């Protein structure tokens, strides 16, 4: 088991800021407590420098938003270019697949 780090420690950081296009936006679903959940994919494309070489980066990944953030994603809609702030976690407790949990988003 991974030790639980001190919340003030830099080892506890898990923050992602990334831009992309919302794709595959599923119909919203709801938790038993009535919170909206929005699941979608974010398609990212950029140019990045690595070891002095320009690289074209293109990929898609799964993201999930809950409550007010989910409502915002649903309003923004599929095909929109956004900047997302969030953290990475396992898709569920039985999976090792990673997903971005969205804390905030804005249209760009």
UniProtKB/Swiss-Prot annotation:
Subunit structure: Homodimer. Interacts with PriA and DnaT. Component of the replication restart primosome. Primosome assembly occurs via a 'hand-off' mechanism. PriA binds to replication forks, subsequently PriB then DnaT bind; DnaT then displaces ssDNA to generate the helicase loading substrate.
InterPro entries named in the record: NA-bd_OB-fold (IPR012340), Primosome_PriB/ssb (IPR000424), Prisomal_replication_PriB (IPR023646)
The protein's name in its UniProt record: Replication restart protein PriB
A GO cellular-component term linked to this record: primosome complex
The encoding gene: priB
Domain of life where this protein originates: Bacteria
Pfam families: SSB_1 (PF22657)
GO biological process, one term: DNA replication, synthesis of primer
Keyword Endoplasmic reticulum: no
Family: Belongs to the PriB family.
